[in-house]
């Protein structure tokens, strides 16, 4: 089950396409992969940017899906 949330990009590595988002509700950081972003927003994942996303339970813990700038 997914839950729509907002948060701030904490880290993002362009080479690996992976990073972390800190949810606004104070929950544990959520993993993000470049493939979870809308195509035209993939270059905008820089630390400090506010995003909206759906939180899903991935194989390695909380994961972001359907990520876009808020």
Swiss-Prot record:
Cellular compartments annotated: Cytoplasm
SUPFAM superfamilies for the chain: Nucleic acid-binding proteins
InterPro entries linked to this entry: Cold_shock_CspA, Cold_shock_domain, CSD, CSD_CS, CSP_DNA-bd, NA-bd_OB-fold
SMART domains xref list: CSP (SM00357)
GO BP: any one term: regulation of gene expression
Record's protein name: Cold shock-like protein CspH
Annotated organism of origin: Salmonella typhimurium (strain LT2 / SGSC1412 / ATCC 700720)
Lineage: Bacteria, Pseudomonadati, Pseudomonadota, Gammaproteobacteria, Enterobacterales
Keywords for this protein: Activator, Cytoplasm, DNA-binding, Transcription, Transcription regulation
GO cellular component: cytosol
Domain of life from the UniProt record: Bacteria
Domain CSD: 7-67
One GO molecular-function entry: nucleic acid binding
Transmembrane regions listed in the UniProt entry: none
């Amino acid at each position: 089950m997914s839950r729509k949330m907002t948060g701030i990009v904490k880290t993002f590595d362009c080479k690996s396409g992976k990073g972390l988002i800190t949810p606004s509700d104070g929950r544990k950081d959520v993993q993000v992969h470049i493939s979870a972003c809308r195509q035209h927003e993939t270059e905008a994942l820089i630390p400090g940017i506010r995003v909206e996303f759906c939180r899903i339970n991935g194989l390695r813990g909380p994961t972001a899906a359907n990520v876009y700038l808020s």
